[in-house]
Every structure is written in C-alpha cells, then in structure tokens.
Amino acid sequence: MTETSPPPVLDTAQARVLGCLIEKEATTPDAYPLTVNAAQVAANQKTAREPVLNLQTGVVHHALRQLETLGLVRQQFSSRAERYEHRLGSVLDLTRQQVALIGLLLLRGPQTLGELYARSERLARFNDADDVRHHLERLIQRGLAAQLPRASGQREDRYMHLLSGELDVEALQAAAARAAPSAPSGSDSSDLDARMQALEATVVELQEALAAVQARLEAAGA
C-alpha cells in the first residue's frame, strides 16, 4: 500500500483485534506478539473499549488471519503457540504517533482531541494537544481519519478512523447522545473525567500485568 492507496475496509472484529495489537505492543511488550487467546482477552476487555464486545475465539482467529491476508498483521512462529504482530505503521507508512491514534480510534470509537491526548500517554509521546492535532490532520489528509460534525449539545470536535469504510455520522451522533444523556458540566465534569481516567488506567495496568504473567507462563511451558 502507498499514500495514495485507498485504506483497507475492516469489519468490527478485525478493527478491534488490530487495535488490540497496536495497544499491547506498547503496553505489554513482554507479552507481544499476542497469542490468539491473548488477543481474545484484549478484544473483550471491559475497560478502554467502546463498545464492549464478546468475541469468540474462532472469530478472533479468523480476524487475525484476514488481517494477515491484508498484510496488516504478521504471524510469528517462534513458539508452539501462534503469535501475531501488527504491521500498520510499515504498510501505511505511518509514524508511531499516527499508529497510536489509529489504535485508540479503533478501540474506543469517536474521541475528542483532549481524550486522545490523555489516552495516548502510554502508547506514544506527544508534545502537547497541538501535536496530536497535527498528526490527526495528517491522517485526515491521507483519508485514514475524519473530523466529525458536532452533534447537538457537543462542545468539542470528535475524530474517527476510516478503516471501516464510510462513517454513518447520524448513527455515531445518536450513540454518543445515548452514552451521555445527562453529563455534568464545568469543573465537576472535568474532575469526574480525571477520576474516571485514573481508575481506568489502574484497571488496565492490572490487566496488563496479568497478561504479562500469563505470557511468561506460556513461554516457560513452550
């Protein structure tokens, strides 16, 4: 694929699995590349995933093989278990920061600039929110992301990846409205967001520590 090639069109399972590979490469390097089982656990996490899914092992395995066919994933044969790593950056000629942003959008759907900046801390380094905006604009120019029109009541622009085809903007706006029917305003909202992000980060760290232990046990038994 080149900068002028159209982006691939991924289904829900493929998008989730690819996002998980991007995330875990940065957050649990000891457990990466991922086994099929580890990819399934990551795909079905209850935190840092929007929407929460319940993908079966066969669905995850099929998604990995399809991503491999598209050239976005590569299988490693270094142990008894199949392990997979993503190739998004090399295939689409993206920077680490751009790969991280695509990963977040694959895992959590439409997000604001501030959300992407806060959530990207463990995936890639950005100087500030303007740096995030710069990389988002580059992705938009490449046809890999889009800025969504603001829905009624929304104060900030949101961004979404385009790796699953054209966006249904009305459906995305309706989903956002259902997710936050009575959000608090002002400083209360900011404080709540900060507490939720801190709690979410703690839960994810515990899950990743468990995944690293499982990976070491698998390696010891290989």
Swiss-Prot record:
Q: Which Pfam families match?
A: DUF480
Give the top-rank taxon of the lineage listed in the UniProt record for this protein. Bacteria
SUPFAM superfamilies reported for this sequence: Winged helix' DNA-binding domain (SSF46785)
Q: Which InterPro entries match?
A: DUF480, WH-like_DNA-bd_sf, WH_DNA-bd_sf
- Family in the record: Belongs to the UPF0502 family.
HAMAP family attached here?
Answer: UPF0502 (MF_01584)
Quote the protein name from its UniProt record. UPF0502 protein XCV4380
Species whose genome carries this gene: Xanthomonas euvesicatoria pv. vesicatoria (strain 85-10)
